[in-house]
Amino acid sequence: TFPLMFAGVIIFLISLEKVHKEGYRLFTISMLISFGMEFVFQPLSIFLYIFSLFVLWFFRDPERNTPLDNDAVISPADGTICKIDQAPMPKETSLGNEACLRVCIFMNVVNVHVNRAPISGIIDDIIYIAGKFFVASLDKASEHNERNILVMQNKKNEKIVSVQIAGLVARRILSFVEKSTSLKA
């Protein structure tokens, strides 16, 4: 009876929020484990069903209304701006080491973890760097953690670099775009 009631709650929640495809895969796995645990140790299965809900919630992908201005630069991530400063371009890019404006956004576990295009334009380059998984809020995380660098160029040939950095909790970066893809902010 509990699994059927839980399934009804899940269907209702899915109808409220769009969920990223990666979330469905992990949700299915966690639900199968939860269901199997019902026959072994039911109290643990209840906890695992609740964890399954968390998986769906973590991978939510809500619709966004972005400005119609093609020259606008929007935040590529939900989160808190934790630093605005001047910094050199990431050394892995071919853009030199001239200082540029850097805006650091920290995403905690309650933020939407689907990143967006900061500008309308074409992906000029994608650079993946394997690394460690320090707490993302530490300064050393931006240099030592796993990261994915996206270089985009708009119609005015201006470049924007967006760096995704993995952390202790969100330990992997999945990119679903390719070089030369045109994106809209």
Residue ranges of model-derived segments:
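Contiguous, well-folded functional domains in the mature portion of proteins
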Residues: 1-185
